[in-house]
Amino acid sequence: MKKMMTVAALLALAPLGWAGSSADTTDRLEDAAKVMHEIMAAPDKGIPEEVLDHAKCIAVVPHMVKGGFVVGAEHGRGVASCRTEHGWSAPAFFAITGGSWGLQIGVEGVDLVMVIQNEKGMQQLLSSKFQIGGDASAAAGPVGRHASANTDWKMDAEILTYSRAKGAFAGLDLSGSAIRQDDDSMKAVYGPDVNQKAVLNGEVKAPPEAAPFLSAIRGAKEQAAGQ
């Protein structure tokens, strides 16, 4: 039993252990671009064009892990970009932790896209840390070529979520999860004196390795229109 708990603890901590290297941030950007492309390419399951038009920021967590032998906890590291007057900003790096998905056996990876759709949600993302469900509300976003004629999705939550497990779309309750700046990764890419707010406000030039992710963000609307 002790050995099983040790394995569980190592698995839960694994995603946090390799943050901060340039190789990790490059891989994360490439994986995030792939997640965006694949979610948008899913017939009648992609993010609607209207939602993308309305988006203030888009955040992607490739392969968020839930695991543990008692209570499942979320662990993931992602990238985010916000809309500025000059286009989409350079990517900021963040971590998502906490919350619970109930009793779990083993570990499962989930791809997550969060569309921040109003000024309040954007301001929370610009801060160094906030809690979903407390500082900002989240709800499952509409899917398909066009958003529902019902406009509740524009008003009900600051964040619309889209999640995928093993290629299938799945609902995900992020209540209680905390999103914070990934300091190690930010320093690895931008140096020690650049924070998340400066990056997402468009004050920092995007590094070359961000090109695939930013291209996926810019191209998402075209993919939605072509569904």
Predicted regions and their residues:
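Sec-dependent N-terminal signal peptides
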Residues: M4-A14
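Sec/Tat signal peptide C-region and signal peptidase I cleavage site
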Residues: P15-A19
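Small-residue-enriched, tightly packed secondary-structure blocks
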Residues: G20-Q227
